[in-house]
Amino acid sequence: LEQVIATNDIGGIAGVGNRIGLLMGTMMLAAPYLTSAGYHAAEARHARGIGREFFGDPIEPGTPPRTLMLTDTFDELNGVAGTMRNLADRAAALDLPITVVAPGVRSARKNGLITVRPLVSLPVPAYRDDSLALGIPSLIELLDIVEESGAEAIHAATPGPMGLAGMLVARVLGLPFAITHSTQLARYTLALTGDRLAAEAVRASSTWLYKQADLVFTPTALIAEGLAAEGIDPDKIRIFGRGVDTRRFDPSRRSWFARRALTRDADTVLVLVVARLSKEKGIDRLIDAVNMVARDGHKVRLAIVGDGPARAALEAKLEHSQHKLLGPMVGPRLAAVFASADIFCLPSMTETLGQVALEAQASGIPTIVPRDTALAEQVIDGVTGIHAESASAEDIAAALLPLVTDEHHRLRMGEAARASMMSRPTWDDIFAGLVDHYADLHRDDPVERLMLRRSIEAGVL
């Protein structure tokens, strides 16, 4: 399989589709194992059904199923990976019936997490200069994990190879399947390639995948409305929101040293963005917006935290400016930079939620995001931040101006932002709500249950 990647250039979205098709075809060598697993799973369901009809259901109604959460991203620096790491930690600590399954350099198991070594990793064309890759898992290994863990449902956190493999395994074994709409793939494709046909193909394939699921989770109401408009049954859409660690992200983390490293002028207003450095995030437009405000005679500077394929282009754009590109940050350093800034702004149109917007507000700084986006659901316009009319440089500059010029207004918004995040559900609340939604996943096919009951009544069994 590795020779497929080594001997074939992967160019563009179509190339990725061809290679994924070839790899999935190769994986169909596992078909005999899948057929056998499906047969034994059906027999097991039948046996459970007989036992239930004669002796009663040993499982209390409303009990959530043991669930495997499959994700294509875990160790990377992005919102989905952060949520998965948090979930793995909290699942073990809170004894939640969830185990996260993620790609890793080797197969391993520990509390709350199982890592599987991919058969092969596919580089993503738009991120050739980056480490981002999609791992194709072994279906046989996933079957083993389901059997050994006693999983009763599968949840795909991402619609990539792990999610597709999870759907296939769930269907073979007759298990309920859920999926999270974690990334606006069609918008990403359009932003990265400019190819509307490719974006439409991605949209259609994603919609097809969501229609196969028993439940579809989404982080915001706006995204849920969009899925319903695409033909996804609204009755199976659930909101799986996000929490924020208000102890880690706290105004008390404000650091004189961090502030001094970013700007030596106490009167300069510091604008912060924390994001993956890629085209769709709109950071180039944010640079232009800050420059517009500065040209009007205001003391303002931009700090950029993150890494990604657009880093070289952004460094070139910043070469003769006083703005700073700080690279990736995590932990206490990131918390200190958040709390030491004056304004946060993310002019992205592709977010499904925007975890960094929550972290900025928890740190006590007002947040600017484009109107009519999932990001805007996280910010109360005029209270905890400002909804820019669009993601254009001109509209972002217009949103920045009142906060740059009025310190008291800025501080009031920051205080309101902190208070808003303090009243938000905690991560433990969010994960408990997710488990409650799992109770809506049926362990056994109701049609099969009805047929079994009729067989018993007819004296066949």
Where are these regions (language model features)?
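Short hydrophobic beta-strand element within catalytic cores of glycosyltransferases
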Residues: 366-370, 379
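Conserved acidic donor-binding segment of nucleotide-sugar-dependent glycosyltransferases
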Residues: 226, 381-382, 386-392, 402-407
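Carbohydrate-associated surface elements
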Residues: 104, 222, 243
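A short helix/loop element that forms part of the nucleotide-sugar donor recognition site in Leloir-type
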Residues: 250-264
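Nucleotide-sugar donor phosphate/pyrophosphate-binding loop at the beta->alpha transition
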Residues: 176-178, 186-208
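Conserved donor-binding/catalytic core segment of Leloir-type glycosyltransferases
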Residues: 69, 264-281, 287-291
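Short alpha-helical donor nucleotide-sugar binding micro-motif in glycosyltransferases
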Residues: 210, 328-329, 336-341
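Aromatic "clamp/platform" in nucleotide-sugar-dependent glycosyltransferases that forms part
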Residues: 330, 349
